[in-house]
UniProtKB/Swiss-Prot annotation:
Gene that this polypeptide is encoded by: rbsD
Name of the protein this chain belongs to: D-ribose pyranase
GO MF annotation, one: monosaccharide binding
Organism the protein comes from: Thermotoga petrophila (strain ATCC BAA-488 / DSM 13995 / JCM 10881 / RKU-1)
UniProt signal peptide: none
Family that this chain belongs to: Belongs to the RbsD / FucU family. RbsD subfamily.
UniProt-listed InterPro entries: D-ribose_pyranase, RbsD-like_sf, RbsD_FucU
EC number of the protein: 5.4.99.62
Source species, domain of life: Bacteria
Length: 135
């Protein structure tokens, strides 16, 4: 049995298979995941698990060079935005942050290698993690 890092075998596999610039979408409980997309639905209750706790564990294993957020998060959910940016910055201070309109975010997410649905129940609690390289 694995002791540390991502213990969910499907998420662990998704991260292990990512290459440079591949994307992984970590989304809230209401996000429209495309039919046929590879997904892990972690929701057990409203708010559980939260976006930040899921991202925190994934960052232990995934090298991230950029995150993509919906620009609507700036007005509708600045608390989560700030906590997320701080969390990602602790792991890598050079991470780029890109804001796009929510409709564009949904289009971009369709090219993700996978989706992880959290129990996040705050508006626009979604992030796309863009994989970096370790060399």
């Amino acid at each position: 049995m694995k002791r540390v890092g991502i213990l969910n075998s499907t998420i662990s596999e998704m991260v292990a298979n990512m290459g440079h610039t591949d994307m992984l979408a970590i989304v809230d409980m209401g996000f429209p995941i495309p039919d046929g997309a590879k997904k892990v639905d972690l929701v057990v209750d409203k708010g559980k698990p939260g976006l930040l706790e899921v991202v925190e564990v994934i960052l232990k294993e995934l090298e991230v060079e950029k995150i993509i957020l919906a620009e609507e998060m700036n007005e509708k959910n600045p608390e989560t935005r700030d906590l997320l940016i701080n969390l990602v910055g602790k792991n890598n201070s050079n991470v780029k942050i890109e804001f796009v309109p929510h409709e564009e975010f949904k289009k971009i997410s369709r090219t993700s290698k996978g989706f992880v649905r959290t129990g996040a129940d705050r508006p626009y609690s979604n992030v796309i993690l863009v994989s970096g390289v370790i060399f």
